[in-house]
């Protein structure tokens, strides 16, 4: 074998092919080419690939003059389909550049005007992916790794060259199918897909879809490559290439033809193209409506429900196969996408989309299509109601004319009913709904929410006239009870949606608020006693609590009956308990609610009574929130909480960084906008109701902060005047009188700051004096205690002396008698009894 290997001189072959001469020379060239093919029939060594490629190029040039070179050229190309062979492991790396260039040359050879050559090139490329080892190997050689050729094809940008070659086989079906087959294999690589996209592969393949092909392979191969491009390359770039009217029209024609197809493969291809159409529809720039494709899809999506004849779907028959089921879901999905495009609203309205979707809003006792299984019908039902949530806000008039509110309310009534129903819960939309009706309830409420969120009076009135408030409260009560058994994201979402719907319905309508207060407050109160740890569970408790607070604001505040009922049920206490958690995202809304409630005189009384942990008062809590807010906003304060800058005492760090920007009169300045964004204005409003005097539970630092809060509105006025002054001076020079006024306002603001600083200083000095006085009192107590202890010690020492020294005892006795005698009156009283100072029979020395 080695001897044979050395007997083929490739340099000699190349030199021979470069000669052009007589007929005999041509025969000699063909003979030597056959010898080369025979020699390498078991595979090409990597070291010879570059020379074989040069021989290929020379043969291609010869072929233009002599057709006899076609066969040897094809035989040489066939060698590239065999495994390359290496002598050393390092050969794969050492010859990688030469091999990449050689494989790239295969792509360039697609320009050779020979069908046989083009087909053989494609066959060899396909062989890269189905590598079979030859019967024999060259002695001392091993085949390269299985992916070696594929990697070198990526390096040589073979896929890009093949895409460009599609233009050369435009009218040659067999060659085109082989090129597509090769591209199909190449498109399994993300790198090759990227190269194909650069060569505009998506648009070229889309135009291939509707080509004449009795076998049907053209459409399947093209769609498969398009799928790979969408998955492995830039989806945005692929969609951008398919957005031309010509491409969309071609896609539509193929889809319409496949609609009437009866083969299983036709249905599969139809669904594949429908997915591609869905991806295109997501891009507003794609002319789906202009091409008429959108109308075809909408009519097809609704034809089985509305049962109205339409020429666009003539010949289409639903077979209830799995492919038709998948198509139905894809069409529902397309309807949801079209609902986001305002220009498609008319098409959706004219083609009965609303009645088609509402067809599924009914209980599942009798499935709409007898040929769908129960699980399939349930999946379609849930999908349709989910799409209804997207379509309904776009077609409000149709929604109302079809009595959708009535259908949804009746359906929701069935959802909380006791009649037996076993849901499968297999689909995406059916999650958490196995064995119950929670999935149906969830999507029905989502549809209601989407329409109510429009704040359309006609929708709200229509709902309330049908008793929606009472019914929604019943459903909310049902969901709350179910949550006690087993809490989950679906039940939390249901409760959140109901609270939102009630908020919109009751807002600005006292009569509806009264209806809500009958049962709603009792249901609402428990939400405010939620375990704070649940807010971080990630299940949606935080959204539920915010919805409950929003519902309280919209459904209770403003109606005295509802307010009194809420306050009597300890509602203000619960709100303050929540506020004491100091959750950043809750504080603003809770303070806003308390400000609204503060118009009710009972509110301030309850706020004054409330006590939190460690006997904290409402005033202390509000002051703590104020200090934390100023810390977050970067307001400058000293270690005692006193004002540092008397000219700008409450300005935030953000405001200080802002340059002077002249604004129109209708546009609020930073000082005004800060009021709505910060909680300080709300805290100030609450203190205006609570009062600034005789507030229990406050420390000296609290009183220092309270002095700032008390003058908040004055400081704000000063801020606004400073902004006015800065804006005027930026553009103009004020006249003398205006200059005087601006200066006066600035001085007033500065004086206010100094006054507050003086008050704060007085508070601190008073506290300091009190601390000194307390310290003196404590010192006196310590001194008295020490004196007492010394006296006790002295007494104890005397006692020890008397008990251990008899002479001392006698002396003490004598002293005692002398003291007794001295204490007696000198004048004797007649018949006075004589009292002995000795205790009889006493044997102690005390």
Where on the chain are the PLM-derived regions?
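Alpha-solenoid helical-repeat scaffold
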Residues: 39-42, 391, 401, 462, ...
